[in-house]
């Protein structure tokens, strides 16, 4: 491998380019002596030399460059410093080697500078570690603690941009919750089947009498040894079976004539421990479902009202976030979750799928076979609208979702009976009225007061203008009258003077 000639170091305050003076032909460059030299500042300065340091103009530029580097892109700032400080390729020397910390940045630099070969091997990482260790001494003009503060500020800004933290619209928890809910459903089903099979050796008839997994696990914990069941257990059994004394009595009767074998206390103890795990997982699954519903009503109330909390959460999870879902067209929302079928249909030139995740909605199951595609298209359109309202409204409310749901129900009825549906304009007007109605009385009163004060101000301005106009007109009339009087006096005087002259 070619020796390293230059080193690129990305600081939170700017980019630095170093020239590597280490004679890498020596076998020592591959031994511990190099790492020891790196730890000593005096010895490390003999290995590298600062060529140029280009500071960022501000925190915004630093964050922009950090985002570019994380995505493996060459920013304009990085391109400029490399262009100015790396020697151009010549006939004698065609390529230049540059040590970088992130190997994903290499292809982008190679694309911009074809004569630069990027290296991120162990030696390159050791040299970069040395620069990071002695940064305050290498970059002149920096005070103690400046680099740490810059790193902290940039780290917070970068993390905030990545997480996109928002108390009201933190949809990341929804994505994690729905993924965990799906996993729990699979695990509970698998574990419950194992409990049924295991306990079935002792009491095989119970599985047919009680098909529900959670109830079965609870009964296993209560019954344990089937021989302990008697008529006194009827009341407690009925409590576990939703007060169904008929099934409880059948359980007791079957326990007396059961074909199952007896099992030891140790085996029964293990069965009960596993049944307890299934019951606790089922309890946690219920808590998680309640949490998901609550979170969906906070983050995406209209989408939840329209299509349900679970399907809405699946749509958000599949899109990546509520913002991504709101940016997608209704046709994309319609087939979310059916990508494999879509690409298979495009490849074989067959019929594309009509629905994806929204297939599990009650609206599509209610529609007839010929109307399933039509209602799925209409429902996807309303889901797209609901997600946009949820994402961009400052105070999300479920009133728009309830009106959109009403429209979908009416459209479903229209396909069956031909009854006309509510128009979009009227539906939105109705939703806006409900939205304003739901606002607190104080807020509505404040809005009314603002409107009335604005109206009063306009009326006062009109009156003031009217008064000014009247004053102006009076003044003009007065001036005209004065001019007329002056003219009349002048005319009389002139006539008098003429008569006097004629007599003389």
Swiss-Prot record:
It holds the Pfam family NOP5NT. Residues 439-452 have a biased composition (Basic and acidic residues). It is found in: Nucleus, Nucleolus. The modification Phosphoserine is found at residue 321. Keywords: Nucleus, Phosphoprotein, Ribonucleoprotein, Ribosome biogenesis. One of its GO terms (molecular function) is mRNA binding. It comes from the Eukaryota. SUPFAM superfamilies: Nop domain (SSF89124). GO terms for biological process: box C/D sno(s)RNA 3'-end processing; maturation of SSU-rRNA; rRNA modification; rRNA processing; snoRNA guided rRNA 2'-O-methylation. InterPro entries: Nop56/Nop58, NOP58/56_N, Nop_C, Nop_dom, Nop_dom_sf, NOSIC. Residues 299-417 form the Nop domain. Residues 439-504 are annotated as: Disordered. GO terms for cellular component: 90S preribosome; box C/D methylation guide snoRNP complex; nucleolus; nucleoplasm; nucleus; small-subunit processome. Residues 468-504 have a biased composition (Basic residues). Its main location: nucleus. Required for 60S ribosomal subunit synthesis. Present with 13500 molecules/cell in log phase SD medium. Belongs to the NOP5/NOP56 family. PANTHER family: NUCLEOLAR PROTEIN 5 NUCLEOLAR PROTEIN NOP5 NOP58 (PTHR10894), NUCLEOLAR PROTEIN 56 (PTHR10894:SF0). Interacts with NOP1 and NOP58. Component of the ribosomal small subunit (SSU) processome composed of at least 40 protein subunits and snoRNA U3. This is Nucleolar protein 56.
């Amino acid at each position: 491998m070619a020796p390293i000639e230059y080193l690129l170091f990305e600081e939170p305050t700017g980019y630095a380019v170093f020239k590597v003076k280490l004679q890498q032909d020596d076998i020592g460059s591959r031994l511990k002596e190099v790492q020891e030299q790196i730890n000593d500042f005096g010895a490390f300065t003999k290995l590298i030399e600062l060529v140029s340091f280009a500071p960022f103009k501000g925190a915004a530029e630093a964050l922009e460059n950090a985002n570019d580097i994380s995505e493996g892109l060459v920013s304009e700032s990085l391109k400029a410093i490399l262009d100015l400080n790396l020697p151009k390729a010549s006939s004698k020397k065609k390529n230049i080697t540059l040590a970088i910390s992130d190997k994903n940045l290499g292809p982008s630099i190679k694309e911009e500078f074809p004569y630069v070969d990027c290296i991120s091997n162990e030696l390159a990482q050791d040299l970069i570690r040395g620069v990071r260790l002695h940064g305050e001494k290498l970059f002149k003009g920096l005070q103690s603690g400046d680099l740490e503060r810059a790193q902290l500020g940039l780290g917070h800004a970068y993390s905030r941009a990545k997480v996109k933290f928002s108390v009201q619209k933190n949809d990341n928890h929804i994505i994690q919750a729905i993924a965990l809910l799906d996993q729990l459903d699979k695990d509970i089903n698998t574990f419950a089947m194992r409990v049924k099979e295991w306990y079935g050796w002792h009491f095989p008839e119970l599985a047919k009498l009680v098909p529900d997994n959670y109830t079965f696990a609870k009964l296993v914990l209560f019954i344990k040894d089937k021989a302990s069941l008697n008529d006194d257990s009827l009341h407690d059994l009925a409590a576990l079976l939703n007060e169904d004394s008929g099934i409880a009595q059948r359980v007791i009767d079957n326990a007396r004539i059961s074909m199952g074998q007896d099992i030891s206390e140790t085996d029964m103890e293990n069965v009960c421990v596993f049944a307890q795990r299934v019951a606790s997982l089922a309890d946690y699954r219920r808590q998680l479902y309640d949490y998901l519903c609550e979170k969906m009503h906070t983050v995406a109330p209209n989408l939840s009202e329209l299509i349900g909390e679970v399907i809405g959460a699946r749509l958000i999870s599949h899109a990546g976030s509520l913002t991504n879902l709101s940016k997608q067209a209704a046709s994309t929302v319609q087939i979310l979750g059916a990508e494999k079928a879509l690409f298979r249909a495009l490849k074989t030139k067959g019929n594309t799928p009509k629905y994806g995740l929204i297939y599990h909605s009650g609206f599509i199951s209610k529609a007839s076979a010929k109307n399933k595609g039509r209602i799925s298209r209409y429902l996807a359109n309303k889901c797209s609208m609901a997600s946009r309202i949820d994402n961009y409204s400052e105070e999300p409310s479920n009133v728009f979702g309830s009106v959109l749901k009403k429209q979908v129900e009416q459209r479903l009825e229209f396909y069956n009976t031909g009854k006309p549906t509510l128009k979009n304009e009227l539906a939105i007007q109705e939703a806006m009225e409900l939205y304003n109605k739901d606002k607190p009385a104080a807020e509505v009163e404040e809005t009314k007061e603002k409107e009335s004060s604005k109206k009063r101000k306009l009326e006062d301005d009109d009156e003031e203008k009217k008064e000014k106009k009247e004053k102006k007109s009076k003044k003009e009339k007065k001036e005209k009258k004065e001019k007329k009087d002056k003219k009349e006096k002048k005319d009389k005087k002139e006539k008098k003077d003429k008569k006097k002259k004629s007599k003389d």
